[in-house]
Design a protein with these regions (language model features):
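Bacterial N-terminal signal peptides
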Residues: 5-13
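Acidic Gly/Asp/Thr-rich repetitive segments characteristic of extracellular carbohydrate-active
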Residues: 18-48
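Extracellular beta-strand-rich solenoid/capping regions of secreted or surface-exposed proteins
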Residues: 31, 46-59, 66-110, 121-128, ...
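Parallel beta-helix/beta-solenoid
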Residues: 34, 53-54, 61, 79-80, ...
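Extracellular beta-strand solenoids
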Residues: 41, 52, 60, 66-68, ...
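Extracellular beta-strand/beta-solenoid scaffold signature
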Residues: 68-76, 96-104, 119-126, 146-156, ...
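Functionally critical loop-and-helix segments that line ligand-binding/catalytic clefts
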Residues: 239-243, 252, 266-269, 279-406
Length: 406
């Protein structure tokens, strides 16, 4: 055999052997680390799954990859007081039933920070885990339609966790379920289904997040006493998209947010009890198809100091009732038709919003297809010019701002 042919055969054998060699086990390194110790593995790819069952620190320095091999979850944090940072975690299984996740946390007071999670069905799953910090992680799910992905972060039956400054892209949701007193702050979430949904999770703080190009921004369902503050929610423009939806939740504060370019800016239903109010103040609600939408409105909400700008419809009401029983005061309306003769920045007359031809598509769902069509626009013009019947008043703001808040 010619020498060059022998060399080719040898090289091919080496390449095949290298491909067939599985990555080393990460579990062995974890097991060899003492309680309270620090594991700094050599750069490279290691095989999961791995279970951490003692307080310790794992620091991958951004150069250590933990690969799940496409089966199950990758890293189980079944302890308290541990730190996991600087890892690249990838290739979970595909099971929604088993909640295959890059990191599953079932202990308290852990830190998970500065990790990269990719090609993982669920990103970080906290189950019966309290007072953990999840910070500065970059998370993406499997490449699939939004509803077929897993949650970027999922919190179940867990309290007082902090989810801070994470970059989350192309996941299904960030879900908080049966979990009170959690804080979700400073995160960026893009191209998800529900950027955040809270279900039976009272006393949540949602602050200073950037939510863009998601089907829906923030949803509260049966989650009382939440604070939604200082977030920017934009470009949720599908038919059913909403910036902030508050359903069956009372004593909720929505303040200082910017909600722009959404199908519906804010959606809410009526509180069960009069004392369970929605407080909406100092928000900018602009360039939405509908600024604010009520369903089954009975009043009781406090809506002060907001700026309603360039919305196709400022406020709409579906179902029974109207929005006049809410406390509207000091809001800026860009379609206000009045003066400010004493220059106190308060309009000389109240802002009043009426429904003319809009009543057709508000009361008849099938007619919503024709919303803002030339026919309905002409009918609306004629109704305003010479009403066929008394229009419905949707709201009255007794002290509208004359200039837009800065």
């Amino acid at each position: 055999m010619k020498p060059w042919l022998v060399c080719l055969v040898v090289l091919a054998s080496w390449a095949q052997a290298a491909q067939a060699t599985p990555p080393p086990s990460f579990q062995a390194l974890v097991d060899a680390t003492p309680i309270g110790g620090t594991l700094r593995p050599a750069p490279g790819i290691y095989a999961g799954p791995t279970t951490v069952n003692k307080p310790m620190t794992i620091d991958g320095g951004g150069k250590v990859t933990l690969d799940g091999g496409g089966t199950g979850s990758v890293l189980f944090l079944a302890t308290s007081g541990a730190t996991v940072r600087g890892l690249i975690l990838q290739n979970t299984g595909q099971s929604h039933d088993r909640l295959d996740a890059a990191i599953t946390i079932s202990g308290d007071d852990n830190r998970v920070e500065n990790n990269v999670i990719t090609n993982s069905l669920f990103g970080i799953h906290l189950r019966q885990a309290n007072r953990n910090l999840v910070k500065h992680n970059r998370i993406s799910s499997k490449h699939a339609e939004a509803s077929l992905r897993g949650d970027g972060i999922r919190i179940w039956n867990s309290v007082e966790n902090r989810i801070e400054d994470n970059d989350i892209n192309e996941v299904r949701d960030l879900t908080v379920m049966n979990s009170p007193r959690n804080r979700v702050t400073g995160n960026s979430i893009r191209n998800a289904r529900y950027a955040m949904q809270f279900v039976f999770s009272p006393h949540a703080l949602v602050e200073n997040n950037s939510l863009s190009s998601n089907i829906t921004g923030i949803v509260l369902l049966n989650s009382d006493s939440a604070i939604i503050r200082g977030n920017r929610i934009s470009h949720s423009m599908e038919t059913s998209s909403v910036g902030v939806a508050v359903k069956k939740s009372g004593e909720v504060i929505v303040e200082g947010n910017e909600i722009v370019h959404c199908a519906v800016g804010v959606l809410t239903d009526s509180p069960f009890n009069p004392e369970e109010k929605l407080i909406l103040r100092n928000n900018r609600i602009a360039h939405n198809t509908t600024g604010m939408q009520f369903y089954g409105e009975r009043g009781g909400h406090i809506i002060h100091g907001n700026s309603f700008e360039k919305n196709l419809s400022q406020v709409v009401v579906f179902g029974s009732g109207n929005a006049t029983d809410n406390d509207w005061r000091g809001n800026y309306w860009d379609d206000y038709q009045g003066f400010d003769r004493n220059q106190d920045n308060i309009g000389d007359k109240p802002y009043e919003l009426y429904a003319y031809a809009d009543r057709i598509w508000m009361e008849t769902p099938m007619a919503r297809f024709f919303r803002n069509s030339p026919v309905l626009e002409l009918l609306d013009f004629l109704e305003r010019l010479a009403p066929f019947s008394a229009p419905d008043m949707l709201l009255r703001d007794q002290a509208p701002l004359f200039h837009r808040p800065k």
